[in-house]
Amino acid sequence: MMQLPERVEGLHHITVATGSAQGDVDLLVKTLGQRLVKKTMFYDGARPVYHLYFGNELGEPGTLYTTFPVRQAGYTGKRGAGQISAVSYNAPVGTLSWWQEHLIKRAVTVSEVRERFGQKYLSFEHPDCGVGFEIIEQDTDGQFEPWDSPYVPKEVALRGFHSWTATLNRNEEMDSFMRNAWNLKPQGRDGNYQRYAFGNGGAAKVLDVYIDEDERPGTWALGEGQVHHAAFEVADLDVQAALKFDVEGLGYTDFSDRKHRGYFESIYVRTPGGVLFEASVTLGFTHDESPEKLGSEVKVAPQLEGVKDELLRTMNDPIVI
């Protein structure tokens, strides 16, 4: 199979169907020290829900964890094969003991220190909805500048994403897609894990695959407790269009049209492994809020400004920071 030009640059954002907005704030902001950089609404379905964005100071690509708190919709998703199963953050070398103690103080059940691909890490789950997280020790060179959080000292703060892990039953077809269509390069194996990287790797440049032949497929619908999609960065709309054209030419035709998401432009493709990938062009978060005010107000489409208060009452999902 023909290998395409290297158009995908790295991890952009991860989007997760969670439980409650306050549960997300309690974990992402008050425990992990991220900034709530944007509060918007998601309008699909019978009732609106929040779409929340967490990251570093300006929500740079490679730091963005976005959530749909969907508990009120009453549908719980099933985690399983064909999904992102863990989101891993970078932490400075020597800080895992601090993070372990901090998580325990915050009533988060956390693992002992483990090692994979020669790197030490902790694993834990979102206390409110069960989605998987890891904190991995890595040199801070070339990593993202952390948000100056009142909850986490800057010297131990998380510095954007290290990697994401996809759980699959098999990897043959997904391996071909990632190498030939998504320009990921195999980096080696550790047990049932296969590592891939963009370019030479580094912060927000790594994707791991965990093979579990017995794991049942997870659900694709937007249900509480599962990662909905994994978004990857591309430089601009022309690169995005060329990527779609060429990947479809390889036979991977399950692509969406371009979607304007307010803060990025997106196309989606269902991969052979079942994981929903997105190619995302960054537009930024400061066109409707100043940098110092990011995340302070709920933002809605202009045509909905007149009914914003009514929508918020309908959601009935208050946030206290």
From Swiss-Prot:
Gene3D superfamilies linked to this entry: 2,3-Dihydroxybiphenyl 1,2-Dioxygenase, domain 1
Pathway membership, UniProt: Xenobiotic degradation; gamma-hexachlorocyclohexane degradation
SUPFAM superfamilies per record: Glyoxalase/Bleomycin resistance protein/Dihydroxybiphenyl dioxygenase
Family annotation (InterPro entries): Extradiol_RC_dioxygenase, Glyas_Bleomycin-R_OHBP_Dase, VOC
Annotated cofactor note: Binds 1 Fe(2+) ion.
Expression triggers: By chlorohydroquinone, hydroquinone, and 2,5-dichlorohydroquinone.
This protein's record includes keyword Cytoplasm: no
Protein name: Chlorohydroquinone/hydroquinone 1,2-dioxygenase
Organism: Sphingobium indicum (strain DSM 16413 / CCM 7287 / MTCC 6362 / UT26 / NBRC 101211 / UT26S) (Sphingobium japonicum)
